Amino acid sequence: MGDYGFGVLVQSNTGNKSAFPVRFHPHLQPPHHHQNATPSPAAFINNNTAANGSSAGSAWLFPAPATHNIQDEILGSEKAKSQQQEQQDPLEKQQLSPSPGQEAGILPETEKAKSEENQGDNSSENGNGKEKIRIESPVLTGFDYQEATGLGTSTQPLTSSASSLTGFSNWSAAIAPSSSTIINEDASFFHQGGVPAASANNGALLFQNFPHHVSPGFGGSFSPQIGPLSQHHPHHPHFQHHHSQHQQQRRSPASPHPPPFTHRNAAFNQLPHLANNLNKPPSPWSSYQSPSPTPSSSWSPGGGGYGGWGGSQGRDHRRGLNGGITPLNSISPLKKNFASNHIQLQKYARPSSAFAPKSWMEDSLNRADNIFPFPDRPRTFDMHSLESSLIDIMRAENDTIKGRLNYSYPGSDSSLLINARTYGRRRGQSSLFPMEDGFLDDGRGDQPLHSGLGSPHCFSHQNGERVERYSRKVFVGGLPPDIDEDEITASFRRFGPLIVDWPHKAESKSYFPPKGYAFLLFQDESSVQALIDACIEEDGKLYLCVSSPTIKDKPVQIRPWNLSDSDFVMDGSQPLDPRKTIFVGGVPRPLRAVELAMIMDRLYGGVCYAGIDTDPELKYPKGAGRVAFSNQQSYIAAISARFVQLQHGEIDKRVEVKPYVLDDQLCDECQGARCGGKFAPFFCANVTCLQYYCEYCWAAIHSRAGREFHKPLVKEGGDRPRHISFRWN
């Protein structure tokens, strides 16, 4: 738009008018041939011209430490060059800056060329930069900064300057001023809430120490144009370290206005850890954040640099706190939305371990914030840790109250060491809710059987071999009364070779199922899956239409047995002890292991495992189950009851409970010494014994008073213990 300024006339207490200077274009300015001591910015604000004849200045602004004329503002370019060289030499020595040779080595060739091209326009900045920079409103300018010895040509330390607000008294050395060859102004940082005092040693600008753990809710994510005054005030000056003149910072046209309420984000714009990245080159990753074609731009809204507008400092500060607070979106029509920060997610892919439990506070330790400078850091914020925690919560809701469903998948038996001979083949995967099933219902609840083929928990192939998920024996109920074996076979032959069977078929010599149900024994397990796919699901049950000579398309219930329902681990952290396992006889076949575990845990507590005994060939339930407890008290309470009422849905049956007897245990009394190392044949289920005995030890122990009525249990076929009558000799 051009190099223009404006002036404001304010009424002082003395009645005189203090005319604030107007910056004119260099071609329109008259030449001057004298130079006085360059005043401070505060003095320049309160400076009175010779026309009003007063040196007091405006009483409501800052007192002028030196008298200054408006004619002293603009210098010749030749004299400014010499003063600039004289000013920078002692300043570089005081602030331990690298030598010009070293700076030339660090400076990129493109930036170095820019500095040489703009040296002519930049020649008068250090000599009278503080005059040219005062294009802002004089009302707010006094709160931006005080005189620093590194700004003007005067090298006298201004030790008398102090903060006008007593509340802000702790200041720390930060960044020395430097000229910008791009915008022809001295770039400086914001100093909100007070006027920092200048250092008497090296002229470095001082600003307040704020703790890093300031609440993230007061960050810099406020829009630059939220305030009503932001539309009426031009740019505020901002100091910049002279080392960073090699990586020139540009203001993005997308956010031309600084935040008007400077006290809101003062604590986050001057953080000590921001100054550590000044000497680091900008990252080309941030080029998407600014319309500038050069990768050195960090003044765009998305730029994570140390001086960027738009609240990126407060946003980055919140990332370190893991507060989980998303930045406020800008309401400015000129400012980009912060949603563009998520573009960085494409460059830094999330690790596959995001689903592992992860603490919010430990999340910052593994991030790239400690490696990359601000422009290079991934913009994942706290959503990564927040999303990880939400996933853990959702997964916990799908687990059981005390244990984990889907504890082990087929082929992963190593996750829980269970004796396969004693406790079953696999740990199952099933759902607790809902459990509305009946005697003719398999109780699968909300697990559609026909959709099981595509279930992520069921693997159709494993190590090149097909994994069976269903028993080859299928229950069919509700058959027409006049249907015979041949008609049943013809109705289901399209799914694969099969044999029709029902209880006592050989003895009855009947061609019709006596009670309206039968079992289909398929040759291949894939035939069962094909049958399930052809069924119609209603209320969690599967139906298929079958015709007879008198009834056409009668729906019959298809009840397959899911192999994963044979076992259920409620508490995988507890070891399974055979001495704390009970045998449950007469279990209804639709009852699943998870349902048996929940019933026993509700009655006695401490259940860690439940299993359904299945046929070793067809893997179909045999009508018995096992329950393992984690403590002796629950085990004794279960076997002392002897009978348990199993109530679940339509199931209401009284079953018998006995200790689970093993056939490979040595005698607990003699450890096989009296019986030649043979396994103990007897087990005493009385709560006073609960031990295995050989024949000799049983006779010796139970001949005592009070134990003569104990009945031993023996292991027999079908994993069922039975009572035997022990006769005394």
Swiss-Prot record:
SUPFAM superfamilies: RNA-binding domain, RBD. Residues 24-35, 232-249 have a biased composition (Basic residues). Residues 20-49, 78-133, 218-328 are annotated as: Disordered. It is found in: Cytoplasm; Cell projection, Dendrite; Cell projection, Dendritic spine; Postsynaptic density. Residues 301-313 have a biased composition (Gly residues). Zn(2+) 1 binds at residues 667, 675, 694, 697. The record marks 561 as: Important for the positionning of RRM1 relative to RRM2. Residues 541-543 are annotated as: RNA-binding. Transmembrane segments: none annotated. Zn(2+) 2 binds at residues 684, 689, 702, 710. Residues 472-563, 580-662 form the RRM domain. Expressed in pancreas in islets and ductal cells (at protein level). Expressed in melanocytes. InterPro entries: CEBP_ZZ, CEBP_ZZ_sf, CPEB, Nucleotide-bd_a/b_plait_sf, RBD_domain_sf, RRM_dom. The modification Phosphoserine is found at residues 97, 99, 137, 252, 255, 330, 332. GO terms for biological process: cellular response to amino acid stimulus; cellular response to decreased oxygen levels; cellular response to glucose starvation; ionotropic glutamate receptor signaling pathway; negative regulation of cytoplasmic translation; negative regulation of neuron apoptotic process; response to ischemia. Residues 83-96, 285-300 have a biased composition (Low complexity). Interacts with TOB1. Belongs to the RRM CPEB family. This is Cytoplasmic polyadenylation element-binding protein 4. The lineage of its organism: Eukaryota, Metazoa, Chordata, Craniata, Vertebrata.
